[in-house]
Amino acid sequence: MRVSEFWRLMDEEFSPSYSRVLARDLVLAGVGGNTASEALRAGFDPKEIWHEVCKMQDVPPSRWLGRDVSPKN
């Protein structure tokens, strides 16, 4: 997963403004006790970070992949 995909999923699930608050403040045990922002800077896999955020925020697994995006023509 690219970092841009991580942010797209965060924005879709939590809204653009609240996703930044979560990334800055929510401590994720699964990525070394870092916040999502810290974990991204430290080089953790964005997909791993996304899954940790989903677990901590009780996002249903059915929404972990986000919504379908149509390919550009």
Where are these regions (language model features)?
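C-terminal alpha-helical interaction appendages
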Residues: 1-73
